[in-house]
Amino acid sequence: SRVLSKYYMKNGYELKISDVIGLGQRGGGVESHFRYSTKRVLSPFIKAGDVDYLLSFEQTETLRYLHCLKDDGVVFSSTFELSTSSVNTRLEKDMPESKTELIKQSGKKTFIIDPEENKSPDFDISKMMNIVMLAIYAEFRGYPHDEMIQIVRESVPAKFVAGNLKAYEKG
């Protein structure tokens, strides 16, 4: 959300952001509500059914928040899966269905990103899925490539710039 916020601020939008971090070890999620507009934005929170775009780095999280999307909302999801703590402790069974298939069956326009597809011995893309997904989202939205590259360059610590730019190009 930090990189996107810089893009929107540079382009004259008002924005509000809220990060909600649940207790992951207890099955809680992490979510960022991000609203921008040319008009005044009063609250960062978006009610269920009003979300335009869902970007998710883990499939259970994608399924958890699918209901928040508008009918014509768009999903960007990684293929990465984590078992919940209740599955790990055998209190519950994991879903037998493919989570990717369930996401696709939602009827939403869906982009599934597989970090394994671009893995190489010298570059672990899974560590930078946020930047890969940002690049895919920015391309989908038609944001200027050069401007986004510059914002990524300005947004990450110097020692991580090269890796993040490589991840952006992979996206």
Predicted regions and their residues:
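Active-site cofactor/cluster-binding pocket
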Residues: S1-K170
